[in-house]
Amino acid sequence: MKINSPQFNLMHKACMKASKILIRDFGEIEKLQVSEKSPGDFVTASDKRVEKVLIGELEKSEYSFLTEETGSIDGKYKDKRWIIDPIDGTFNFLNGLPHFAISLAYEENGEI
């Protein structure tokens, strides 16, 4: 994907908007609602908020989604999809370690 492609620009805008939530929530970790999906695998209210913002921004493309928290969401274009992990490094995030990221990929015809 080229850096000036429409997909890249949309990804950048979505991540910048979602990162504001992460920065705010990282400063208030003790107030976050946390659930355990499976032993040792946690989901936070921040995961859900970030995913919601990313989907809200990216759904304009009408592509499909594969997300860590929601799963698959079909869009108009089945051969193009966004792959989202809203907080890659949730353990670090929850423990106040600043080593986490929003992971977002664009897949077209099975290639990232």
Q: Each PLM stretch: what is its role?
A:
Residues 1-87:
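N-terminal subdomain of lithium-sensitive/metallo-dependent phosphomonoesterases centered on the IMPase/IPPase/PAP
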Residues 76-112:
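DPxDG-like acidic metal-binding loop motif
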